[in-house]
Amino acid sequence: MDEQKINKILTYMGFAARANKIAFGKDMLKEYLSDKRISKKVLVVAKDAGERVKKDLRIRCDINKVPYIEIADKKTLAKAVGKTNLSAVGILDENLAEAIIKVVQAE
């Protein structure tokens, strides 16, 4: 994925964070991925996240049919949403999740 698309995704993630529409942390992400009330979901994972974490999240995404995107590193991902050291972020806002999916599909 090129730098421009990554920046666009990180910007959308920043919008979601400012609107308090992000899920992060193991328990919050588990709940988010299995929540049937949210129809459009996307999970953004840092490339340098632990292999065990990535495997667990990928399996959960496959089970719940949620798009799984790997971009940037933990530091960049965390900075985009105003946190420190994040491995994965779920987008709770359906419009922003759909916008991120469209950016990825435009490859």
State the predicted function of each range.
Residues 7-45:
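N-terminal first-folded block
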Residues 36-58, 67:
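N-terminal positively charged helical leader segments and presequences
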